[in-house]
């Protein structure tokens, strides 16, 4: 297996313009494909997940052109539901941001479509979404294991009264919200259980509004969506920088700044993960906000005990930042780490112990006490981009760290390690 050893880093300083947000990129691509008119998307993320979405749209007959660096996409919308040219199988890798929304959107047509992906995708639950789509009339079969992909879709979704479980993934609700306006009937979506990752629903609603569709949101417990609507292209749309990707650089600034400035997001960003900066501030770093930047300056870091449900992806970065904080850090209400690219709670606990931390892994929390001195270890990344990026922070000590399968960052940030090196002064 390929590996990358990062030597100790004395200081991190400078600015980085963030790649486009994965969450925003894939939502914007799907809405542009469903919309009337041509959309020009700029600062689109070039990554595995986005390529899977683009390949699927291409197979569904959507025409688009990409710039040489793949960050600008000119896409001609279908002006309604996506239509397959006959029976079709779409391979979506391990891209939840493609699998969930497409599973819903493709229930509007009548063709037979199979959605499948990598082995890990077949372990990521989708049963709650399928149950909700079936309540709206969709005809869906599981082809292997009940409640998991691959799925066979045969259209039939018309809207109506639908319940969705919000406790596992907000992507299920996102998928229903984006599909419902195109259904023939009005749709009322009721959310059961505590809605996780609520800020991601705000991204969805914000993008739908940009494409001309507004819905009634009753305290995130009930959503009323008029049927028979159309999305309309906004013309040009700038994808904001990826706030989850910003977390590694902001954390590096907190631990070994200098000052690190990330551009492409700021105080007006629609992504909930910008709240990660507030957590670093609570830990002792200094944060400066602009309209299109966030800067972090080193401070003496101390441990925190916090509910992280609102920033589940960026919260992983706090788990490795905790190695540099005084005291024991507890991250709570993070059960949905277990159903991401890998079981992130198990993976994080396992790898933190390798570098010497004392770790308590609960059902939905993790408690981390840093060692007096970090140990050099080979870090397993579990084919999870965030594990690789989180553990790069270990090098901000006087100990090297070896990252196994470093190319897994291609899911959201293909040149992450080059960018980190560019801003780092070796010890």
UniProtKB/Swiss-Prot annotation:
Residue positions binding 3-phosphoshikimate: 22-23, 27, 169-171, 197, 313, 336, 340
NCBIfam families listed in its UniProt record: aroA
Reaction(s) the record says it catalyses: 3-phosphoshikimate + phosphoenolpyruvate = 5-O-(1-carboxyvinyl)-3-phosphoshikimate + phosphate
Subunit structure: Monomer.
Reported function: Catalyzes the transfer of the enolpyruvyl moiety of phosphoenolpyruvate (PEP) to the 5-hydroxyl of shikimate-3-phosphate (S3P) to produce enolpyruvyl shikimate-3-phosphate and inorganic phosphate.
Binding residues for phosphoenolpyruvate: 22, 96, 124, 171, 344, 386, 411
A Gene Ontology term for the protein's cellular component: cytoplasm
EC number: 2.5.1.19
Keyword Transport on entry: no
Entry annotation: catalytic residues: 313 (proton acceptor)
Identification of the protein by name: 3-phosphoshikimate 1-carboxyvinyltransferase
Keyword field: Amino-acid biosynthesis, Aromatic amino acid biosynthesis, Cytoplasm, Transferase
Family that this chain belongs to: Belongs to the EPSP synthase family.
A Pfam family this chain is assigned to: EPSP_synthase
The UniProt record lists the keyword Cytoplasm: yes
An annotated GO BP: aromatic amino acid family biosynthetic process
Protein's cellular compartments: Cytoplasm
GO molecular function annotations of the record: 3-phosphoshikimate 1-carboxyvinyltransferase activity
Organism in which the protein naturally occurs: Salmonella paratyphi B (strain ATCC BAA-1250 / SPB7)
Biochemical pathway: Metabolic intermediate biosynthesis; chorismate biosynthesis; chorismate from D-erythrose 4-phosphate and phosphoenolpyruvate: step 6/7
PROSITE patterns: EPSP_SYNTHASE_1, EPSP_SYNTHASE_2
Domain of life: Bacteria
């Amino acid at each position: 297996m390929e590996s990358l050893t990062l030597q100790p880093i004395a200081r991190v300083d400078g600015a980085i313009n963030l790649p486009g947000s994965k969450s925003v990129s894939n939502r914007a691509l799907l809405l542009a494909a469903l919309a009337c008119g041509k959309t020009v998307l700029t600062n689109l993320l070039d990554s595995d997940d986005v390529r899977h979405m683009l390949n699927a749209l291409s197979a569904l007959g959507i025409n688009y052109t990409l710039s040489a660096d793949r960050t600008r996409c000119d896409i001609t919308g279908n002006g309604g539901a996506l239509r397959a040219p006959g029976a079709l199988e779409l391979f979506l890798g391990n891209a939840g941001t493609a699998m969930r929304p497409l599973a819903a959107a493709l229930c509007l047509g009548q063709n037979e479509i199979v959605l499948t992906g990598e082995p890990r995708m077949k372990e990521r639950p989708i049963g709650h979404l399928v149950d909700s789509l079936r309540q709206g009339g969709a005809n869906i079969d599981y082809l292997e294991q009940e409640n998991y992909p691959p799925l066979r879709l045969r259209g039939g979704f018309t809207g109506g009264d639908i319940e969705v479980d919000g406790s596992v993934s907000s992507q299920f609700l996102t998928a229903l919200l984006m599909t419902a306006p195109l259904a023939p009937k009005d749709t009322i979506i009721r959310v059961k259980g505590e809605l996780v990752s609520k800020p991601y629903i705000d991204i969805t609603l914000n993008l739908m509004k940009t494409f001309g569709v507004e819905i009634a949101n009753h305290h995130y417990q009930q959503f009323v969506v008029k049927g028979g609507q159309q999305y309309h292209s906004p013309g040009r749309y700038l994808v904001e920088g990826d706030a989850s990707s910003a977390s590694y650089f902001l954390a590096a600034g907190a631990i070994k700044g200098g000052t690190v400035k990330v551009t492409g997001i700021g105080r007006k960003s629609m992504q909930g993960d910008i709240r990660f900066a507030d957590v670093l501030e609570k830990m002792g770093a200094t944060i400066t906000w602009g309209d299109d930047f966030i800067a972090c300056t080193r401070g003496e870091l101390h441990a925190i005990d916090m509910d992280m449900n609102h920033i589940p992806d960026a919260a992983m970065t706090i788990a490795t930042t905790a190695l540099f904080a005084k005291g024991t850090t507890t991250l709570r209400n993070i059960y949905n780490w277990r159903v991401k690219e890998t079981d992130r709670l198990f993976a994080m606990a396992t790898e933190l112990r390798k570098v010497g931390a004392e770790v308590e892994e609960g059902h939905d929390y993790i408690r981390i006490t840093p060692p007096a001195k970090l140990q050099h270890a080979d870090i397993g990344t579990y084919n999870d981009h965030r594990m690789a990026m989180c553990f790069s922070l270990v090098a901000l000590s006087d100990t090297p760290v070896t990252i196994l399968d470093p190319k897994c960052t291609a899911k959201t940030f293909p040149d992450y390690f080059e960018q980190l090196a560019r801003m780092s002064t070796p010890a």
